[in-house]
Amino acid sequence: MKIDVNSDMGEGFGVWRVCDDDAMMRIVSSANIACGFHAGDPAIMTRMVRLAKAHGVGIGAHPGLPDKLGFGRKEMAFSADELCQLVVYQIGALCALAENEGMRVSHVSFHAAMGNMINRDDILALQVMQAIHRLDPEMIIFSQPDTIIERAAREAGLRSLTLFLADRAYDAQGHLVPRGTAGALISEETQVRDRVRQFLEQGTVKTIEGDMISVRAQSILVHSDTPGSVELAAIVRSEIEACGGTVTPAADVIAPS
């Protein structure tokens, strides 16, 4: 079993950092690198690319809205064309920096409010995916399973890789419990270990209501801003390996056998 472990990386500006990116890069197999709008700057982006290259980690763009004060979690009013431009601009910036270091951007993982806006509008989602396809038809789209983003990626001719979020609670419909709701964020190590083991062995997760639902995923995400994120990511990786799995970058997970 090949499975990816990913985290959002380079989420800072100047000397400010969200997490220990150096430590996290030694654990994950794919890095979603902030591209300068909600977080990130050219120096940080370049450092993340170099770290990923040193550790054999796949590189992905993590575009967000230009909401620095709200860390990209506040929705903003943009037309569909404007939003497509924001996405392409950020991916393009990371692609250029990566190419300059002899690396390639392989995937896209939308950040917070940007992802929420795209994922509730079929027409907008398709426009965004078509814009990404024009930029690079080999790009992989990270999404949750059975979502507008996953369907739009497929319709646009892009490959997608589905996620299980180790540090976020799900409701009975398989949706993420909104941040700010009690129990939405899961940072207790034993709980994360149990959730990941259940997903790996049974393909299910216990919802916040106490029900069991199926989860279809090829990658496990740990948010870098979750308290103890590095330790949680290490737990995720150890559970995969204990189950006989191989942790490998997204492009290798979905590559033809």
Swiss-Prot record:
Q: What organism is this sequence from?
A: Pectobacterium atrosepticum (strain SCRI 1043 / ATCC BAA-672) (Erwinia carotovora subsp. atroseptica)
Keyword ATP-binding attached:
yes
* SUPFAM superfamilies the record matches: Glycoside hydrolase/deacetylase
Q: Name one Pfam family in it.
A: LamB_YcsF
> Which Gene Ontology MF annotations are present?
5-oxoprolinase (ATP-hydrolyzing) activity; ATP binding
Coiled-coil residues are none
Q: Which Enzyme Commission numbers does its entry carry?
A: 3.5.2.9
Per the record, the domain of life is Bacteria
What is the protein name for this chain? 5-oxoprolinase subunit A
Q: Does the keyword Acyltransferase apply?
A: no
